[in-house]
């Protein structure tokens, strides 16, 4: 987590002055008038349980993000409820956060992941806590809140998530992190007091963005941090970035299953270098740093230009802030976003997409846990004390890799995969396919478009797909495996789900 310095509380000073009985009556009348006026303006109407359930069911039915999670025919049930919102979903995955009052938009967030009310995902817990406070504050004020959707005269109506990594802070990500001890600020994450330190959520966010960019090939210069030891001493750790070669080809989207030694070492090297560049305060119970340090480290050790910026939320109106967010995401630039928790410090995560309503896709940096669309603008620091330190780093793009435009003619159905080199699949921006193609070929096209048959996501540059001179035929391996369902092609028919969740394709 990020460690923020907290300002000391100050007491307001009140000068008591005498007043006469008429002044008292005036004050009393004004006070009563204000109370009555306030009571009249509060028109909050709590949503019934039936209404909340209906809202969630509608989202599950209509949202592409949640369609694949509806394995059960049962209605979603309440997984968590408080005075501000209700989390509706399924035990096997998929949840919707519904506001309990109609002063707010009905849906606060939704995700296709499993909701765990006892999660140790500190970033997600921060959002739940902050959203609860924000909703209570809005209901208390009696002023309705509307979202700021993307201006479709300037931006795309929606940008599907384009970040494919689902990384975390423990093994193998922290395999090269230094040995250390606890931070001394609490052991809320429950890890041991001595041993291997965690990467820190700032480093994980940085690393996921660099992996998405696939740049640079190596770092610049050297940098050092001091790591606290169990005996109270500090041990200096130095990284020579000139010797760090980033093995992008051996990094994978998820390390939750099997991975090779080389794949583990590749991501561990990147994580360490990100942490040191950001002046990480390494600890076994939570490593932290400031957003400013991450921004400077990206410039100093990774070669990012001076044009990258760290912006503070409290300096912008909600509309202006979200306009910056939409602009970055339209340019396919991931945003490193941070928010403060007055109890547990700060939290860093990645924003990498948005829906038509203006909810942004959040990658919490917890191996995919709770990733989904969230109303981040709800947390307005101009009216809520808790979010005074929301920041974001924008302008994060590296040197563009040379993309490929390819035309392939399939002579024998099912052979498309053999006609395109694996090393170029992620770099194809325009693909034209001629000839007869079957289900196996469609499976390959979906893979190039960033979506494997089992639904896992991988890096993709494919923006334009041309099948105008292709003929769909039956046969081949299934192009989608959804539970027990295996979808295959039929003659002269493009299946409805042929390109479902192929997030990179913009022209077909």
Region roles according to the model:
Residues 20-30:
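Bacterial N-terminal signal peptides that target proteins for export
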Residues 31-39:
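Bacterial N-terminal signal peptides
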Residues 40-44:
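Sec/Tat signal peptide C-region and signal peptidase I cleavage site
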Residues 45-81, 96, 102-172, 176-177, ...:
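Cys-His-centered catalytic/binding microenvironment captured across papain-like cysteine peptidases
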Residues 70-92, 296, 300-363:
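Active-site-adjacent substructure of cysteine-protease-like catalytic cores
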Residues 104-287:
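Active-site-adjacent structural segments surrounding the nucleophilic cysteine of cysteine proteases
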Residues 406-410, 430-436, 460-492, 502-508:
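Structural signature of tandem-repeat unit edges
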Residues 498-499:
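Hydrophobic anchor residues at the C-terminal helix/turn of individual leucine-rich repeat
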């Amino acid at each position: 987590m990020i460690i923020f310095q907290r300002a000391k509380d100050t007491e307001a000073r009140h000068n008591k002055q005498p007043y006469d009985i008429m002044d008292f009556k005036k004050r009393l009348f004004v006070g009563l008038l204000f109370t009555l006026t306030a009571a009249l303006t509060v028109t909050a109407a709590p949503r019934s349980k039936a209404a909340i359930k209906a809202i969630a069911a509608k989202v599950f039915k209509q949202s592409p993000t949640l369609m694949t999670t509806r394995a059960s025919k049962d209605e979603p049930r309440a997984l968590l409820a408080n005075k501000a919102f209700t989390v509706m979903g399924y035990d096997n995955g998929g949840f919707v956060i519904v506001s309990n009052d109609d002063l707010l938009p009905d849906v606060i967030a939704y995700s296709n992941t499993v909701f765990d009310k006892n999660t140790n995902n500190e970033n997600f817990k921060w959002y739940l806590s902050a959203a609860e406070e924000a909703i209570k504050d809005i209901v208390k004020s009696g002023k309705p809140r509307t979202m700021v959707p993307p201006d479709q005269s300037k931006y795309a109506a929606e940008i599907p998530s384009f970040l494919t990594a689902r990384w975390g802070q423990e093994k193998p990500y922290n395999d090269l992190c230094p040995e250390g001890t606890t931070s001394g600020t609490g052991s809320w994450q429950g890890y041991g007091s001595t041993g291997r330190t965690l990467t820190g959520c700032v480093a994980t966010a940085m690393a996921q963005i660099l992996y998405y960019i696939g740049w640079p090939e190596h770092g610049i210069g050297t940098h050092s941090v001091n790591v606290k030891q169990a005996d109270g001493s500090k041990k200096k750790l130095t990284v020579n970035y000139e010797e760090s070669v980033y093995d992008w080809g051996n990094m994978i989207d998820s390390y939750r299953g099997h991975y090779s030694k080389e794949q583990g070492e590749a991501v561990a090297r990147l994580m360490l270098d990100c942490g040191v560049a950001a002046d990480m305060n390494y600890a076994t119970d939570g490593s932290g740093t400031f957003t400013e340090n991450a921004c400077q480290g990206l410039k100093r050790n990774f070669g990012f230009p001076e044009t990258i910026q760290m912006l503070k939320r409290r300096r912008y109106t909600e509309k202006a802030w979200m306009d910056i967010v939409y602009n970055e995401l339209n340019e396919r630039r991931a945003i490193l976003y941070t928010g403060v928790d007055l109890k547990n410090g700060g939290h860093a995560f990645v924003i990498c997409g948005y829906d038509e309503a203006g909810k942004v896709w959040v990658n919490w940096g917890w191996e995919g846990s709770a990733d989904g669309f969230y109303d981040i603008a709800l947390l307005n620091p101009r009216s809520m004390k808790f979010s005074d330190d929301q920041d974001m780093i924008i302008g994060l793009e590296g040197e563009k890799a040379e993309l490929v435009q390819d035309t392939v003619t399939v002579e024998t159905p099912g052979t498309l995969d053999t006609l395109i080199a694996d090393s170029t699949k992620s770099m194809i921006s325009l693909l034209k396919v001629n000839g007869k193609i079957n289900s196996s070929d469609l499976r390959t096209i979906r893979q190039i478009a960033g979506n494997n048959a089992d639904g896992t996501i991988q890096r993709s540059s494919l923006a334009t797909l041309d099948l105008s001179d292709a003929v769909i035929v039956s046969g081949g391996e299934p192009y989608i495996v959804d539970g027990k369902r295996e979808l295959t092609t039929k003659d002269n028919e493009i299946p409805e789900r042929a390109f479902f969740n192929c997030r990179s394709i913009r022209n077909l």
